[in-house]
Design a protein with these regions (language model features):
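Regulatory and interdomain segments flanking nucleotide-handling catalytic cores
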Residues: 1-262
Length: 262
């Protein structure tokens, strides 16, 4: 079973920002928010999900998103935002990190798809979609939705900025521990994190969560979602997290819960 990852990058972003002059920071913040919103909308309409890596680079779980779909999104964004171009590198692998590396290598080795100067994919991926109009059957995504258990208690003890400092410290720890499992972690804002984690078992995530809790002295919950596409896996993970909260309200403590959608 494999996962497909797409790396989306704004080309020439640094030089482009300099053209806006020294009073550009507010303009850039507005642009980044608008760009993310439009790109997320284009991907989620196709059952994918998008995460910030850097503000000029984003990463999507793109299971089943064909080469033609990528080309359509590229054209839509280029039409919306005159003066900038985006590139997309597509990769597959047994783990999210492997798929990410495959995507990176397709770009590094300049393996362009036909009809585009900025969409990259291995010959294997191009053949996979050229020979079928259906989504590949062996793709799936597993996502962990992690949050702080009863974060209101923490917010009552610390100021907002101090809370952010603690959360960033925790984010660093979560990234470190999950990249060892060839998984990819993203901060969603608030006290929420998501981990793309195809090959990590429920037992292993419980072990990792316990280690993080012991080092940070904060309780965590983790909803596990599995589905064929990124968007559905995220929905399942969030439903699992909601179930943990519902069980907690009934006096049942189950910090890790999993839901799989077929």
């Amino acid at each position: 079973m494999t996962i497909q990852i797409t790396i989306i990058k704004i080309e020439g972003y640094g030089p482009w920002t300099l053209k806006l002059g020294s009073d550009r920071e507010a303009q850039l913040q507005i642009f980044q928010a608008s760009f993310y919103s439009d790109l997320q909308n284009l991907f989620t309409k196709r059952n994918c999900i998008l995460y910030f890596n850097r503000f000029d680079e984003l990463i999507a779980i793109s299971n089943g998103l064909s080469i033609d779909d990528h080309l359509f999104i590229e054209q839509e964004i280029n039409d919306m935002y005159k003066g900038i171009e985006i590139s997309m590198a597509i990769g597959t692998g047994e783990t999210p990190l492997d798929a990410n590396i495959a995507a990176h290598n397709s770009r590094k080795n300049n393996i362009l798809v036909s009809k585009s100067k900025l969409v990259y994919a291995s010959e294997q991926i191009q053949l996979m979609y050229n020979n079928s109009t259906k989504s590949p059957m062996d793709m799936f995504a597993q996502v962990f939705h992690i949050d702080i258990d009863n974060s209101t208690k923490v917010s009552n003890m610390l100021s907002p900025y101090e809370i952010t400092a603690r959360i960033m410290e925790m984010f660093s720890k979560i990234i470190e521990m999950f990249i060892e499992q060839k998984s990819m972690t993203f901060f969603l804002g608030g006290d929420n994190f998501m981990v793309i984690s195809n090959t990590v078992s429920k037992e292993k995530v419980s072990e990792i969560i316990n280690k993080i809790q012991d080092s940070q002295n904060i309780k965590l919950n983790c909803g596990i979602g599995r589905a064929a596409t990124g968007r559905k896996a995220v929905q399942a993970a969030t439903e699992a997290l909601d179930t943990i909260r519902s069980l907690r309200d009934k006096g049942i403590l189950q910090p890790v819960y999993e839901i799989e959608w077929h």
